[in-house]
Amino acid sequence: SSAASDVYKRQVYKKAHDMLMEAIDDGTFITDKDKAYYVYELTMDGRTQTGIVACASIDDYLNNVIKKHENTRADKELDRINHVDTCSAQTGPIFLAYRANAVISAEVAKAKQEKPVYSFTAVDGIRHKVWKISSKESVEAIENAFAGINQIYIADGHHRAASAVKVGLRRREANPGYTGNEEFNYFLSVLFPDEELMIMPYNRVVKDLNGLSEEEFITKIKEKFTVSGSSTQVAPSKKGEFGMYLGKKWYILTAKEEILSSDPVDGLDVAVLQNNVLEPLLGIHDPKTDKRIDFVGGIRGLGELERRCDNDCVLAFSMYATSIGELFAVADAGLLMPPKSTWFEPKLRSGLFIHRF
């Protein structure tokens, strides 16, 4: 029954709280004595990205200084709200992005000349390094620089962010005399400059051709795209280009001029594919709920698309990755990114930094 599972869930959240407290008591987690920022560097396959670990303001989120590009699901939020609320802590940071700033970049470069506080390679081969910035001048320089940045974007972690904000609002209700400086007014984040971020493509695989033969399907595709065969796997090299795998053959698709759009959402490659192929030809109206389509993160490679087509699918599309600039443009326009349009890699590690409130 749902009542029994609610009790079970409460026990799970309580267990998380107890384990966190034990880890604090036994010195696994150490509370910082001074006001500091941390520089957090992740290296994957020789590519490095460096962010700043900080707390973001729930007011900035509510006032849209922190911009979103995805709707959240209430059920996914509730789980995270309960977890954060029961633990009185955020253990997984929100992945935020901003337009690169010279002052912040200089402070980060300076910090990286020191010895890191942490340096380890995780089991998945991703290298994590952390430096601390605690000198008063540097902390103030970074704080002032961020104060002047009026657009910050959620790259990944919309559910975590929405949940952290809702817990903060709960605490405000419980403490009507709040000043706005209490820790519950802030949530744990890592902020990355746009130029450091890598978005990987999110590829598509489809279960059937909606009653069309391969020939009929290709004929219809040719109305909107130029199509040429390829003897090797196709990873698109530019926007407006798509790889297609069908009948054990790869093709390069290039969108014709008339289906391109300058609209921040309709102009995205994932939207071009959805609006000109998936919906009209294959009858996939809502890719979020349609069981005939599946999504494969770019990290898994093109061989995975071939494997799926040998297995439970008949058709695959390899995408050109969405750029961070495209994501910013969608968020700036107050619009939503289409489902499964960005795959951020590497993922931030949970439990490395914890924000208690």
Task: Identify the residue ranges that each predicted region occupies.
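Surface-exposed, charge/polar-rich loops and edge strands
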Residues: 1-357
